[in-house]
Each structure stands twice: as C-alpha cells, then as structure tokens.
Amino acid sequence: MKHRLKIASVIMGFCAIGSTAAMAANHKTPPWGPGPFKVLLEVNQNNRAEWAITINNLRTMERVVGMNTAHAEVLAWGPGIKFLLKNSPYASDIQSLSMYGIKFSACHQTMKAMHLKKAQLASGVTIVPGAIAEIIKRHNEGWTEIKE
C-alpha cells in the first residue's frame, strides 16, 4: 500500500507542477496533453486512508486537470464498497464530486454477497453488474486504471 501511496503522490505532484507551468505559459497545452483523460480509480479495501487519498486525488484532478477534459470513475468492490454507503464518512464527498461528473460505481456482485440494497448507497452512486467486468470494459475503452 505504501508503494501505491507514493505513486499516487508522485502523479499528483507532477500534475500540480505541470498546472503551474501551464498557467504561466498563458493557456498553452499543458504538459500532460490536451485530453480527454479517462481514469478509473479502483478501491477494494475498507481502509479510510485509501479512501481519503482517493477523494483527495479526485479533488486534485478536478482542480488541476479540470473535469472538462477528464472523465473519472471510482469503482468500489469487496470491503471497499462500505465507503459508498449513506452512512459513510465520505457520503457528502461522493455527492459533491458527482456534481462535477465524477462517477461512483458499486459492484452488484459485492452488494449481493454483503446483502446490501440500492437504498443503502449514498446519493450519486450507480451500480455496475460486476467489478471485474467494469474494469475490463473500461480498459478496452482506453481508460487508465489506478488501484488505490
């Protein structure tokens, strides 16, 4: 997990540095390219630190890259699905980030295994048939996967 945290921090650091350079260059194409960008963030652990990093990465992406050139989806499955519930400490973050077009997806297979109902999910969460199928689908569509 520490390795993933370091990678995520380095990526966000480069984005922040690139953003400053891009603004200084008076609206030239940013160093990461013109987009569009498609990012799938996969979370399958019931770990508050990982979810906090995921939320922070999404806010950074929205601020630095801009959601007009980026599409982001957070896919939660296994124990990680607990953070998509209404009573999650991140329910308000999910709702506010959804307003920027960020998609939050819950694995239906995990929901069945954990006896969860759609009504238990936070506002803004959609259900996908299965996490593995969603990962494969997004990969085939050219999305970049970041495993939090």
Question: Could you tell me what each predicted segment is?
Answer:
Residues 87-148:
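A cross-taxonomic marker for long C-terminal extensions/tails that follow the last structured domain
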Residues 63-99, 104-105:
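Mature extracytoplasmic domains of secretory-pathway proteins
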Residues 25-73, 83:
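N-terminal secretory signal peptides
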Residues 10-19:
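Bacterial N-terminal signal peptides
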Residues 45, 79-81, 111:
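Short, glycine/serine-rich, charged loops/turns that create anion-binding
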Residues 43, 76, 108:
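A cross-domain feature marking catalytic cores of carbohydrate-active enzymes
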Residues 1-10:
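Bacterial N-terminal signal peptides that target proteins for export
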Residues 20-24:
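Sec/Tat signal peptide C-region and signal peptidase I cleavage site
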